[in-house]
């Protein structure tokens, strides 16, 4: 697979992660995923990664 066109991940920690999830999912309609917040903080997440929580 070629990752040249892949969306770059953005590191989101704490409040920034929660705000990104709420913005992407629309309000509080999202389910937690164990380890997702630490993954996004350490390695970065794409919009597609966050939309999995919706």
Curated annotation (Swiss-Prot):
InterPro entries linked to this entry:
Insulin-like, Insulin-like_neuro_ligands, Insulin-like_sf, Insulin_CS, Insulin_family, Nem_insulin-like_b-type
Write out the coiled-coil annotation as residue ranges.
none
Q: Sorted alphabetically, which Gene3D superfamilies does this protein's record hold?
A: Insulin-like
Question: Which keywords accompany this UniProt record?
Answer: Disulfide bond, Hormone, Pyrrolidone carboxylic acid, Secreted
Record's subcellular location? Secreted
Pyrrolidone carboxylic acid occurs at which residues?
A: 1
Report disulfide bridges, numbered on this chain: 13-41, 25-54, 40-45
List the SUPFAM superfamilies: Insulin-like
Family indicated by similarity: Belongs to the insulin family.
Question: Subunit details for this protein?
Answer: Heterodimer of a B chain and an A chain linked by two disulfide bonds.
Write down what this protein is called: Relaxin
């Amino acid at each position: 697979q070629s990752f040249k066109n892949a969306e770059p991940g953005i590191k989101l920690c704490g409040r920034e992660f929660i705000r990104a999830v709420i913005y992407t999912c629309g309000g509080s309609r999202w389910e937690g995923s164990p380890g997702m917040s630490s993954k996004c903080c350490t390695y970065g997440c794409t919009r597609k990664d966050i939309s999995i929580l919706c």
